[in-house]
Amino acid sequence: MVQAKILFAAAEAAPLAKVGGMADVVGSLPVVLRKLGQDVRIIMPLYGFLWDKFGQEPGQYPRSKDPIWSKQVMGQVADIYESVLPGTDVPLYLVSHYCFAPHRIYYGEDEFWRFTFFANAVAEFAWTYYPWKPNIIHCHDWHTGMIPAWMHQAPDIGTVFTIHNLAYQGPWRWQLERMTWLPWYFSAHNTMAAGILYADQVNTVSPTYAMEIRTPLHGEGLQDLLAWKGERLRGILNGIDIDRFDPRTDPDLEANFSIDDLSGRAANKATLQAKLGLTVNPDTFLMGMVARLVEQKGIDLLIQALDRFLDYSDAQFVLLGGSGEAYYEGRIREMAERHPGKMAYQKGYQPKLAQLIYGGADAFLMPSRFEPCGISQMIAMRYGCVPIVRRTGGLVDTVSHHIPSKGIGTGYCFDRYEALDFYTCLARAWEAFQHKETWQALQKRGMASDFSWHRSALEYLRMYELILNLPLLPEKPPEPPNSPSSSPPKLKKPISSQPRSKGIPELQQRPEE
């Protein structure tokens, strides 16, 4: 077994900075990989709201007030501080510059410049920080897409690019030309395309999404490039932190419960109803949703179908909405006003309320237009909250349709992105809820599902092995079946497909235990 040095580069990492599911991946996967014997570290921007915590909470500030690295990047000075991811032993590098000072992660007129600067700083750091030099830089989404393009000139550093959401592709080439120097052979349209083109290996966060993005419907204009990537594009399903998301010990619940004793869910449901002004009734079908108010999450479909469903049933609905579009927020508020005592809307991400929704609601709604993976449905099932989802992306890989006559399935699914199909699915779930024994069996099947990060981490190690040509797994498990891939078209061979040197000489052989 060999120990590799792997640097995760991302815009978010839970629990320090979180907007979407990428933060959960970056905050959880390195912890598991370190347990499997790898030297994994994280690098991310030092946002203004993190500065405010320095000196207040142990583990959330640099070990030294002086930067460990300071150099010119894109004509500006970048400083890097060393810290540790709170609650773990994962080393954390924080890139400091005044452009990250505002108390935000995304948006703003300088968003493209900020993350291009961050990507350049990561590349320079990997090249020049001699106390620790990574063998692989694991990049996440468009914010780090330029790193594989720059690092391809370094044959001793491999790159992995993970696509969390193909819809967000970053600055286009003409914008990049104004911000930074580009090599003459750069041929990607934007930073997302650059990451896909130049990375040694590319993966998405679910097998189904890896197949979907090779088609015009989901490819966002990059389907030909993704199809050309062939076997170097794969889907690895995300996991969840099963220690953090454990209904037996979760401190944010009114009452804890387990797969063997679900009685605590009734107390959580009553607390949730009372807290949000809903009619307290244990026999009412209570649906929950935790999502950003954007089209991707199916908010337009939700407005069409749920408004009528609440009119014609005794069901209740709770929505915890994060950042999103003002239009959808206005429509949701109007719905809540039309259904007093039956619908509640809370704005902004509230972790404690989210946990109470998972632990108290009967069903969890995810009518997504597209969903690269989705974390919420896995958390919901772990808490006995039955998911109602549209079959797309990672929802296909994690939720199976309930067939009462056969006693199989973990949730309710519909295919077409149409209000009638969603309404019908809601009605079927509501009807099944009336049969308590059947519903409880459905809950327990979901709770028994294995969504731990361990299996996913082994898949990532297999992918790293393909880059390093060295064994990283403690024991060689059987290889998974080959995932479907498209044959590369006959194109001029770009520099991104040139073979690398065999192995990394700096790696040290670890003694077998």
From Swiss-Prot:
Q: Give the enzyme class.
A: transferase
* Record-linked SUPFAM superfamilies: UDP-Glycosyltransferase/glycogen phosphorylase (SSF53756)
Per the UniProt record, the source organism is Synechococcus sp. (strain JA-2-3B'a(2-13)) (Cyanobacteria bacterium Yellowstone B-Prime)
Give the pathway.
Answer: Glycan biosynthesis; glycogen biosynthesis
Q: What is this protein called?
A: Glycogen synthase 2
Sites where the protein binds ADP-alpha-D-glucose: 18
E.C. number(s) listed in UniProt: 2.4.1.21
> What does this protein do, in the record's words?
Synthesizes alpha-1,4-glucan chains using ADP-glucose.
